Amino acid sequence: MSSGNFQLLAGLGNPGSKYTSTRHNVGFMALERLAKKESVQFAMNKKIFGHIANIEIGANKRKLLMPNTYMNESGRSISAAIKWFDLEINQILIFVDDMDLPLGKLRFREGGGSGGHNGLKDIIKHLGSQDFCRLRIGIGPPSINQGDRKQKTIPHVLGKFDQAESKVITKVLDKVIKGLEVIEQYGLVKGTSFLNSSLTATDG
């Protein structure tokens, strides 16, 4: 069981300008916003197949990782980082998009399956375990018509947020940062409760 002492915060996404600000890259967006807040830059680390940055949350130092693999190969970077930094599986937190959650909804969970997400699926395969923490960030479903949902999934996740959606996501990512601070200051239970609560008018 995790104590909330996350040494590695990893966001999932696809590398390259083609995928910048797409729904599937909201995990990257969370880390980029956190790095911007802390005025730090990412640098490529070829040994872990990803871009890394160092930040401080409260009095504690943390590492941010954006895999330079494509989404479906995220596990290669995550597993390499765990070995390189000599971490335990309960010391990592994965930020990932979830189209089964309404836009703006957050869901923190320790353990569980991939939920059909190929990035999580690859991480589970490489680690040989699903007992890691993940923060799912809701991007909303592609269509209310479930009959053509599968057909619209790829265009949806690789599409960009519109102006109204972007405003919601900005508030959500600010809430993610606040949630990490709550975890550092008050512990995982209170932090999880904060993250899983609905957005309010005062958020962001």
From Swiss-Prot:
The record marks 97 as: Stabilizes the basic form of H active site to accept a proton. SUPFAM superfamilies: Peptidyl-tRNA hydrolase-like (SSF53178). The active site is at 24 (proton acceptor). It is found in: Cytoplasm. GO terms for molecular function: peptidyl-tRNA hydrolase activity; tRNA binding. Pfam families: Pept_tRNA_hydro. The record marks 14 as: Discriminates between blocked and unblocked aminoacyl-tRNA. Its main location: cytoplasm. It catalyses: an N-acyl-L-alpha-aminoacyl-tRNA + H2O = an N-acyl-L-amino acid + a tRNA + H(+). One of its GO terms (cellular component) is cytoplasm. GO terms for biological process: protein quality control for misfolded or incompletely synthesized proteins; rescue of stalled ribosome. InterPro entries: Pept_tRNA_hydro, Pept_tRNA_hydro_CS, Pept_tRNA_hydro_sf. Keywords: Cytoplasm, Hydrolase, RNA-binding, tRNA-binding. Its EC number is 3.1.1.29. Gene3D superfamilies: Peptidyl-tRNA hydrolase (3.40.50.1470). It is an enzyme of class 3 (hydrolase). TRNA binds at residues 19, 70, 72, 118. Monomer. Hydrolyzes ribosome-free peptidyl-tRNAs (with 1 or more amino acids incorporated), which drop off the ribosome during protein synthesis, or as a result of ribosome stalling. Catalyzes the release of premature peptidyl moieties from peptidyl-tRNA molecules trapped in stalled 50S ribosomal subunits, and thus maintains levels of free tRNAs and 50S ribosomes. PANTHER family: PEPTIDYL-TRNA HYDROLASE (PTHR17224:SF1). Belongs to the PTH family. This is Peptidyl-tRNA hydrolase. The gene is pth.
